[in-house]
């Protein structure tokens, strides 16, 4: 689309609205002269309110990019397949492998193995929908940006906001994991109540600042550093699982102490949402957000998503199996729910000590910090791209679109640093963990909807990966994502609801001057019944502080029915082709600014 000495844009503005075509010309000329722009909601509002859409439209000629001697920074498509895959693996193999086997076992006992299977299936479904999307629309901050092209401003702002909140909690969680595994070296990091001391809070903020600075060096430096760290993150947990499995394995643990599923179906489902399973596996999302900086994204993004999830599922499955089989009778005499490791060692290191593999304990101690360090590094970098996307959507101030000389959204990095640091002070660790899972999964529900929307809106686009049986597979993915949100419980839904209200108020404020007609309300009509239904069912249910009026089993049927109905509605409420074409024209202009002549 951008070739030769001139760039041609096809304008979506009808001939009979010349004043709107003139406004469009002004906005495109601002781009051509090096002035970044975000969407002018007022002009778009007038256009979509008054225009009768036609496809017989003129072309607008633009001269080459001129900057008046100022060198513009560009984003860099420099992440190859290995680095992209390792970005996802680093996100998945963060602090999750250190704590998730214990948390899942506490919730479900030996049936936690089933929880990993269900969770892995759910994440593969969601990843498959985004694999097709990212291959045809590889944009930076994809989780927040993709909905803009399928369902418009309100949906993209809502989903991007919830993802942004969740991403900021990820950095908080991983930093605290680093500190928890450093407690033996620096006991002053924590107070007698088990919470971070004032000195510990200061160190946590300094660590966040370090991750911010490292990401500011650019995506190429970030990718190389993460790749080196991720080799350690793969080899150590895989080696630990092999060592424990070959040292001692007690088959009785799978039948005694309450049986294979001591908490029944509810325990399995709780392990998926609040037992660390989804928190661990959802790290694949970073590939979607880094897709805008990937080489050959049409091929590399789908491959990275699938490879990373399969590799990490094998590692997590091995760790969980080893953990369950290595526990001795004294640790299980009070039941799975009371299982704990009160010493300074984490659960995996404690088990390695118990089976006599003392040589690996010191390796685990260092690897634990490296794993969390690398995951925090990835989450900070990924969230900066999401902040950039939210500025492009219009929810965040446009200064957050500014790129540094290394092509990094520097202001987005700095704002995210402040917000992530605040979570250390306002919520306890377990509530931050629950909010992380539910908010990020909520932002993912748009994937199954968008994949069908783009089958209509981008029907002729070549697809390196095609989701098989998309209507059925997409619907199933939407149902599974909805169930995961519900299983997080009523208490978490309350926190998520507060975050959504704050995001909605911010959206109203940001668009109060430009009018609200441009916000694609029709395309967002499915959000209100969906969110209200989830909140109501969560209150009626028995998970996480619910009233208990809706027992386990029937509640799954109710959530599934809600999800299917909303899914059908959401697919029908996709953007009209006219709006989609306009948004894509603006995106192409943005790409030329972000990536230079190679876009």
Predicted regions and their residues:
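Membrane-helix boundary/coupling elements in multi-pass transport proteins
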Residues: 139, 162-177, 281, 285-294, ...
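Loop-to-transmembrane helix boundary motifs in multi-pass membrane proteins
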Residues: 76, 81, 199-205, 295-298, ...
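Terminal cytosolic tails of multi-pass membrane transporters
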Residues: 31, 39, 44, 48-78, ...
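TM-loop-TM module centered on a large, flexible mid-protein loop between adjacent transmembrane helices
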Residues: 145-148, 152, 183-190, 260, ...
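Hydrophobic alpha-helical segments and their helix-loop junctions in multi-pass secondary transporters
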Residues: 185, 231-259, 280, 320-329, ...
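Membrane-interface loop-to-helix entry segments
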Residues: 199-249, 282, 305-309, 436-445, ...
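Hydrophobic, membrane-embedded alpha-helices of multi-pass small-molecule transporters
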Residues: 79, 83-96, 204-207, 244, ...
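Extracellular loop-to-transmembrane helix junctions
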Residues: 76-79, 89, 99-199, 203, ...
């Amino acid at each position: 689309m951008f070739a030769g000495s001139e760039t041609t844009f096809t304008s979506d503005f009808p001939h009979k609205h010349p004043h709107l075509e003139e406004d469009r010309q002004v906005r495109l000329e601002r781009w051509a002269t090096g002035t970044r722009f975000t969407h002018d909601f007022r002009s778009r509002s007038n256009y979509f309110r008054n225009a009768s859409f036609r496809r017989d439209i003129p072309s607008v000629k633009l001269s080459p990019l001129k900057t008046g001697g100022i060198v513009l920074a560009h984003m860099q498509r420099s992440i190859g397949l290995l680095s992209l895959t390792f970005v996802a693996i680093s996100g998945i193999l963060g602090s999750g492998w250190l704590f998730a086997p214990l948390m899942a076992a506490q919730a479900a006992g030996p049936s936690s193995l089933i929880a990993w299977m269900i969770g892995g299936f759910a994440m593969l479904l969601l990843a498959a929908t985004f694999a097709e999307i990212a291959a045809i629309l590889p944009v930076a901050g994809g989780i927040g940006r993709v909905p803009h092209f399928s369902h418009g401003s309100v949906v993209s702002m809502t989903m991007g906001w919830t993802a942004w909140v969740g991403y900021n909690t990820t950095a908080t969680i991983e930093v605290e994991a680093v500190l928890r595994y450093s407690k033996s070296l620096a006991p002053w990091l924590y107070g007698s109540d088990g919470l971070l001391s004032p000195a510990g809070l200061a160190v946590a903020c300094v660590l966040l600042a370090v991750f911010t600075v490292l990401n500011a060096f650019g995506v190429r430096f970030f990718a190389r550093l993460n790749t080196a760290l991720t080799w350690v993150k793969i080899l150590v947990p895989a080696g630990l699982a092999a060592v424990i499995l070959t040292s001692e394995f007690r088959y009785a643990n799978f039948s005694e102490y309450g049986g294979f599923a001591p908490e029944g179906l509810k325990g399995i489902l709780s392990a998926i949402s609040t037992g660390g399973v989804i928190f661990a596996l959802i790290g694949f999302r970073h590939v979607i957000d880094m897709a805008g900086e990937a080489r050959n994204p049409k091929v590399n993004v789908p491959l990275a998503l699938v490879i990373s999830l399969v590799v990490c599922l094998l590692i997590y499955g091995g760790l969980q199996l080893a953990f369950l089989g290595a526990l001795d009778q004294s640790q299980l005499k009070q039941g799975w729910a009371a299982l704990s490791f009160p010493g300074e060692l984490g659960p995996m290191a404690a088990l390695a000590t118990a089976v006599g593999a003392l040589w690996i304990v010191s390796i685990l101690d260092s690897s634990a910090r490296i794993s969390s360090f690398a995951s925090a590094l990835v989450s900070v970098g990924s969230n900066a791209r999401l902040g950039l996307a939210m500025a492009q959507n219009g929810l965040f101030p446009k200064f957050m679109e500014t790129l540094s000389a290394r092509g990094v959204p520097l202001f987005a990095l700095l704002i995210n640093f402040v917000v992530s640091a605040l979570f250390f002070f306002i919520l306890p660790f377990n509530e931050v963990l629950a909010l992380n899972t539910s908010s990020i999964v909520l932002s993912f529900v748009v994937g199954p909807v968008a994949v069908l929307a783009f089958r209509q809106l981008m029907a002729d686009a070549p697809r390196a990966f095609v989701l098989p049986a998309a209507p059925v597979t997409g619907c199933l993915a939407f149902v599974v994502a909805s169930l995961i949100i519900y299983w997080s419980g009523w208490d978490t839904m309350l926190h998520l609801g507060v975050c959504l209200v704050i995001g909605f108020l911010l959206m109203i404020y940001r668009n109060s001057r430009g009018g609200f007609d441009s916000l694609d309300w029709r395309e967002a009509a499915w959000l209100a019944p969906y969110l209200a239904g989830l909140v109501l069912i969560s209150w009626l249910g028995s998970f996480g502080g619910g009233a208990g009026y809706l027992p386990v089993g029937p509640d799954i049927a109710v959530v599934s029915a809600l999800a299917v109905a909303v899914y059908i509605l959401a697919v029908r409420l996709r953007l009209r082709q006219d709006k989609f074409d306009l948004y894509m024209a603006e995106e192409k202009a943005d790409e030329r600014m972000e990536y230079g002549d190679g876009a």
